[in-house]
Amino acid sequence: MIKNLIKEEDIRDVDVKSVMTKSTLPVGGYSVNPYVGCPHACKYCYASFMKRFTGHTEPWGTFLDVKHWKPISNPHKYDGQRIVIGSVTDGYNPYEERFGRTREILKELQGADAEIMICTKSDLVLRDLDLLKTFKKVTVSWSVNTLDDNFRADMDCASSIVARLKAMKEVYEAGISLTCGRASHPRLARIHITLPQVPPTSSIKVFST
């Protein structure tokens, strides 16, 4: 169910030369954002600054541009690179189930010896475990702003906290590395207890902001 239903007239298809953008972020490599805008509409989202570059005047979270690009013909071009999917949108926002643009880019990158990082708040990422497991280096990076789902629902329209934690467990059990970012908020005090108790050598990392 889409919690933040965007009006059909505010969803548009846009053609782009490439979905691969050379990143200026400290992580380097490439950024991939299959959408402009994000229906999760997080009140604290830093990505709303993107409106300056897209000409959108609508409030963040009330529009969605669906990107279409020329398919990647040589995935090996990105060998040795870090590719971050979802730096200024959530590639697994609810409309991904309809448009499948994130799954499409994962298909096009098959065979690349690249480090893939997925940034998401959605359990829809579980749909693509079959593709994610084919990459040698892949991490799913989650953010959790609270363990109180009533508070969470007031802050964003993403998956519930329970759904996120269950999805994190499934991603981990599938052998995929994951990170969990948390905001500095008293209601997050027990996040380390809630996450699976695993040895220090585990592929789960929790960090605070």
Tell where the protein language model's regions lie, with residue ranges.
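Surface-exposed cleft-lining segments at the edges of enzyme active sites
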Residues: G91-Y92, D149-C157, S177, R182-P186
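Conserved strand-turn element in the central/C-terminal portion of the radical SAM core barrel
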Residues: A167-H192
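Active-site glycine- and acidic-residue-rich loops that bind
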Residues: M117-C119, D123, H185-P196
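Anion (oxyanion) recognition and catalysis
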Residues: Q110, Y172-E173, S203
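Conserved Radical SAM active-site core
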Residues: M1-S141, N145-F151, I161
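Glycine-rich S-adenosyl-L-methionine
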Residues: A158-E170
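Flexible glycine/acidic-rich beta-alpha junction loops that bind and position SAM and/or redox cofactors
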Residues: R152-M155, P186-R190, Q197, K205-T209
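Charged helix-capping and loop-helix junction motifs
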Residues: F99-R103, S159-V162, R190-P199
